[in-house]
């Protein structure tokens, strides 16, 4: 763990900055690629290497990115033994800084691949690879997107550390989280389920506001992705929202599979009023552009 976070540029790793009497900013940009995903990715890289060295094995890691996941993954795994990394990103839809972070490392085990499409297209290809069991097993496929549970688990830690610094468990805290693929805010939901006294988790979206529409109206309907200056939020199919639905539907896998089938076939689905009200007890949302 110490090695994973040795490259962070602030002694607190995730410092809190007070903006007003009850308003604080949690700074998550002190990692090596300046992305919050460094918190999980740096740890996962070290855990992968430790496990693979003990077993004498090699794996192939694939991931999809709108920018920050890819640069964080390549930085975390570059030069590590036993790992080959392939990151798919949408051509022309990541920032120039992140494109350079992904494409300029010289280590032979990391590869950035531009895809003609958007992030959802990249993510779909990664899911297809994992669903092709023969291919998955032949190349020993592993993932670093937030479909990997370790990503979510590692991100839950700073919800605990920041809430405790602000007075938890005696004091409730709410978190507003810029949200695209729903992984970071889902980590907050897991922290709440573990007993952290979180009042509300507030989903902040841009014009790609499918999550805001779903949490306020109960309809999860896809539309075209609108490019913005925040490409990690330019997403229509939020993978970790499926995990939240699994909890909201009482861990009924068949019910959630039906919703996902409707999403694929019809471009959306509607929540029951009971499920919507259940989600609204924990979540609020807002949109800005």
Residue ranges: model-predicted function:
Residues 1-289:
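PLP-dependent amino-acid enzyme catalytic core
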